[in-house]
Design a protein with these regions (language model features):
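Long, positively charged amphipathic alpha-helical accessory segments at protein N-termini or as interdomain linkers
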Residues: 1-5, 9, 17, 84-111, ...
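N-terminal lobe of the biotin/lipoate ligase/transferase fold
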Residues: 1-105, 127
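Short loop/edge segments at beta-strand edges and connector loops
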Residues: 28, 113-115
Length: 258
């Protein structure tokens, strides 16, 4: 894919100005950036530490699914947040909104958020986000993992028919560093202010980008496959849908199917 060889994250990070208080560690290859972030948390790394890799040998998504991406083709990162008292799903929302805003600003695309944790362009998955919380009795630590298909071509996504990449959708190679810098700027903005104002605004922004809103979709909930109309997301990250008989149902865990 043209553009990968020139996309040197380490050099970019050496000269870019990050928001105050943020620090980024870049590695060429890791098992998983989430694993690196969790270990860093145990070692006392500070709030707003970011771990980025050019390649992951065992990246994970929701339900332990493997996230594979060719070297230099994706933005693979984890954000360590400390002393956070909001539920983990708040930070899944935050990452999805921040990424969507960054893609829109950088490439003029119109990404939407597919419940519970995907970012899609024209209905095709371009990224996954997942926040995990841990509590040692003194503070809650959040690790937010983000995986973005940046410069993959159609052949590399052939076995994933509902996936796409930013370069495919934009029609040009995309610089991972520029996307990362925008994401951290948006992360920083959403983390500011008082908790109520932040979470209310975040919920509205997340709902405003929700894929399938007011449309009939298929919902996989455990062993049940529902056909329902999406009414919106709740502040706790659950999804409200209306069944064909008019019943409103709250989906706590599940997946929207194409």
């Amino acid at each position: 894919m043209p553009g990968r060889a020139d996309d040197d994250l380490k050099q970019f990070l050496a000269r870019v100005a990050l928001p105050p208080g943020w620090r980024v560690l870049h590695e060429p290859s890791v098992v998983s950036t989430n694993d690196i972030a969790r270990e860093a948390a145990r070692r006392g790394w500070p709030d707003r530490s970011v771990f980025v890799a050019d390649y992951q040998t065992r990246g994970r998504g929701r339900h332990g699914r493997t996230w594979l991406c060719p070297p230099l083709a994706g933005l693979l990162m984890s954000v360590l947040l400390r002393r956070r008292d909001a539920p983990a799903y708040t930070y899944t929302m935050l990452a999805a909104v921040a990424l969507s805003e960054s893609i829109e600003r950088l490439l003029a695309l119109q990404p939407t958020i597919k419940w519970p944790n995907d970012v899609v362009v024209d209905g095709r998955k371009v990224a996954g986000v997942l926040a995990e919380a841990s509590d040692d009795g003194r503070e809650q630590t959040i690790v937010v993992g983000v995986g973005v298909n940046v410069n993959l071509d159609e052949a590399e996504l052939a076995e994933l028919p509902n996936a796409t990449s930013l370069s495919i959708e934009a029609g040009v190679p995309v610089h991972r560093g520029e996307l990362l810098a925008l994401m951290l700027e948006r992360f920083d903005s959403w983390l500011g202010g008082d908790r109520f104002t932040r979470e209310e605004g975040l919920w509205r922004a997340w709902n405003g980008r929700l894929w399938g809103m007011d449309q009939r979709v298929r919902v996989q909930e455990g062993d049940d496959l529902l056909v329902a109309t999406v009414l919106g997301g709740e502040r706790d990250g659950t999804l409200l849908v209306r069944l064909d008989d008019g019943t409103v149902r709250r989906v706590i865990a599940g997946e929207l199917l194409p």
